[in-house]
């Protein structure tokens, strides 16, 4: 007999910033509660959805369930003990959590999502009692309570761009003589893309604390075949700086209102689907809508080089070549999705071709304290994640998907689902490489990215947040901060990497690509010393060492990893000696030389000398470029390109990839 599990799910969004003083290692999680078979119990169902339970049937019984539900018009399953329990709780329906769609059914069955059913019954019946009755049936593997996905965006209010900068303010944050890559007028305020250390923008600030995307744009700016599903508030698909990069379901756009024109199980899903309201229309004007999803979307793929607004990391070059944003709406004003609807949302994103699931939401720090507890309490969600990651999409350069989560904003342990190993957990950095005051951190953290830091800066404090697209109410462009804002930087870089892979005709496995993302970083440890003072206290930065993830995401390194080009990071103004012969494995008797174009020399301020097979390189400017290592052995000439990246500080091993 399969052991039964009965769990309660209560989801809380973690966007409020925690601003207290330092505590003793808040990332050390307490021991998880005893969930062994002998002591497992039903947790409180006080906040769960009344009259509803989620049931996962065994592999052996699912065929009978499917046949029974079809015959009985969704009121009985054909499994006598289960049907008897349904009668006792006055069940009114038994339906599959995800829709039955012929073209995607094989994938649903491969992941096991087809075995999850939603049971609805008289809401006057005790949830706990109903759960016990259903769990007692031998053909049931799991009974899980459903619950609404709560949110709290009140601490994340957008600060309109025009409240920070007057419309006639001179451009700043641009080196003398430099021409921006694109003509978007607010790009120079997006320090998180290119940070020149200009203290007229905000202070404190350090040059190079950015995602290094400008040199990456020389190779790739995006690709419309790459789809990023933004699981959040609705994305304002009419926004002037987003409309051209919105994913569009052409069958529904050109179809009949109220009809599922493409037969995918969802009606009128033109730009995605509104799972909060269970409708095709994506909304953003309800009371309590904050523009959160629209801000996240802009960081990933605001349209580049269109002469307005801001830039997106993978927003293209102004030639309809940016990655596409699919709006997976799970919050709409006072409406929230349930955990089962979220599973449906993830299934939808998978089926409709999204390769990246962008998730700036999750549980509060400490709500779940271990992977075991997470799997016990939210197994249906973990099942949906596995489905997204492992399902192949036709024509995609990624043979599956990647899921990217915000770590949370309580200045404590990384929250779940972000801390779950199969997803990427993103922490937040300020303008000077220090952890944001609010960021969660700890061993589950995978990678760091700019997320801003409202309570830290001395002048123009709002400009130390992340600038992106928002709703008309906030002037279309505004600043926000949080791990909600750092997370889409990683999603954007991942999307840029997949775009470049598409351009080069390369494909990657999900684990392989995830490893490439996590390796495409700059070291943070040199900055994690001493004490950081902020408006509400101090932070001992040593406590964050090894707990912010692998490092700060670097878009240029990501593209070099996709390209297959080795990259080395050199420290600004510090001579660095590299062995040129190492690029040719065990070949001996080599004669090597280094070839550098004038353009790369100028961009990096690069000078070098070669002695034997060793080159000593010095760079005076923070940027990146390709050089060529040439060699000969016998009468054969060989060449190999190498990427040189100059940053303010570098890891002791030179940052080899």
Predicted regions and their residues:
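Bacterial Sec-dependent N-terminal signal peptides
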Residues: 17-43, 647-657
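Flexible, small-residue-rich helix->loop connector segments that border functional cores
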Residues: 216, 231-238, 251-264, 285-290, ...
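Substrate-binding/access-modulating region of protease and related hydrolase catalytic domains
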Residues: 23-26, 218, 222-224, 233, ...
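Acidic-leg catalytic submotif of subtilisin-like serine proteases
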Residues: 138-141, 206-279, 295-299, 303, ...
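Protease zymogen maturation seam
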Residues: 103-118, 132-227, 235-241, 245, ...
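C-terminal subdomain of the subtilisin-like protease fold in secreted/lumenal serine endopeptidases
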Residues: 354-361, 400-401, 501-591, 655-657
């Amino acid at each position: 007999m399969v052991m039964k599990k009965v769990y309660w799910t209560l989801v809380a969004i973690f966007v409020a910033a925690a601003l207290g003083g330092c505590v003793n290692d808040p990332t050390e999680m307490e021991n998880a509660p005893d969930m062994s078979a002998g002591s497992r119990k039903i947790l409180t169902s006080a906040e769960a959805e009344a009259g509803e339970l989620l049931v996962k049937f065994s592999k052996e019984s699912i065929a009978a369930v499917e046949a029974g539900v079809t015959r009985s018009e969704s009121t009985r399953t054909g499994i006598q003990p289960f049907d008897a329990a349904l009668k006792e709780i006055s069940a009114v329906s038994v339906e599959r959590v995800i829709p039955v769609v012929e073209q995607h059914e094989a994938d649903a069955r491969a992941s096991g999502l087809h075995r999850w059913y939603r049971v609805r019954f008289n809401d006057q019946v005790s949830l706990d009692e109903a759960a016990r009755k259903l769990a007692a049936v031998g053909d049931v593997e799991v009974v899980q309570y459903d619950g609404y996905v709560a949110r709290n965006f009140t601490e994340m209010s957008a600060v309109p761009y025009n409240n920070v900068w007057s419309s006639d303010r001179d451009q700043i944050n641009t080196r003398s003589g430099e021409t921006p890559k694109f003509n978007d007028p607010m790009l120079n305020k997006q320090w998180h893309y290119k940070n020149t250390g200009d203290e007229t923008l905000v202070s404190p600030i350090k040059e190079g604390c950015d995602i290094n995307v400008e040199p990456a744009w020389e190779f790739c700016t995006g690709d419309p075949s790459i789809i990023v599903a933004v699981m959040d508030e609705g994305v304002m698909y009419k926004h002037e700086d987003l409309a051209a990069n919105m994913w569009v379901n052409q069958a529904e756009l050109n179809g009949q209102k109220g009809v599922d024109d493409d037969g995918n199980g969802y009606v009128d899903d033109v730009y995605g689907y509104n799972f909060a309201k269970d409708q095709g229309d994506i909304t953003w004007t309800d009371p309590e809508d904050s523009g959160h999803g629209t801000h996240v979307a802009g960081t990933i793929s605001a349209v580049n080089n269109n002469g307005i607004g801001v830039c997106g990391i993978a927003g293209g070059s102004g030639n309809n070549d940016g990655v596409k944003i699919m709006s997976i709406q799970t919050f709409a004003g006072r409406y929230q999705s349930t955990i089962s609807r979220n599973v449906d949302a993830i299934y939808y994103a998978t089926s409709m071709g999204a390769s990246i699931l962008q998730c700036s939401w999750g549980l509060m720090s400490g709500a779940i304290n271990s992977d075991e507890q997470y799997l016990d309490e939210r197994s249906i969600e973990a099942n949906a994640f596995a489905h997204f990651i492992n399902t192949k999409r036709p024509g995609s350069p990624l043979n599956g998907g990647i899921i990217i989560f915000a770590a949370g904003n309580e200045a404590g342990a990384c929250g779940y689902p972000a801390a779950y190993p199969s997803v990427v957990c993103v922490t937040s950095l300020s303008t000077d490489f220090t952890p944001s005051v609010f960021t969660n951190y700890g061993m589950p953290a995978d990678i760091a990215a700019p997320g801003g830091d409202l309570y830290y800066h001395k002048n123009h404090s709002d400009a130390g947040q992340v600038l992106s697209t928002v709703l008309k109410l906030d002037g279309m462009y505004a600043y926000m901060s949080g791990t909600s804002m750092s997370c889409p930087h990683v999603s954007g870089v991942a999307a840029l990497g997949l775009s470049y892979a598409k351009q080069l005709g390369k494909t990657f496995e999900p684990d392989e690509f995830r490893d490439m993302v996590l390796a495409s970083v700059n070291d943070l440890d040199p900055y994690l010393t001493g004490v950081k003072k902020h408006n509400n206290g101090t932070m001992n930065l040593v406590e964050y060492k090894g707990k912010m993830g692998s490092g700060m995401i670097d878009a240029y390194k990501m593209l070099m990893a996709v390209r297959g080009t080795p990259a080395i990071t050199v420290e600004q103004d510090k001579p660095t000696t590299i062995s040129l012969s190492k690029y040719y494995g065990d070949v001996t008797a080599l004669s090597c030389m280094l070839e550098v174009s004038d353009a790369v020399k100028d961009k990096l301020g690069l000078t070098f000398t070669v002695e034997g097979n060793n080159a000593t390189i010095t760079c005076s400017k923070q940027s990146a470029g390709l050089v060529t290592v040439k060699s000969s052995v016998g009468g054969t000439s060989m060449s190999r390109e190498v990427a040189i990246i100059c940053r303010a500080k570098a890891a002791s091993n030179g940052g080899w990839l």
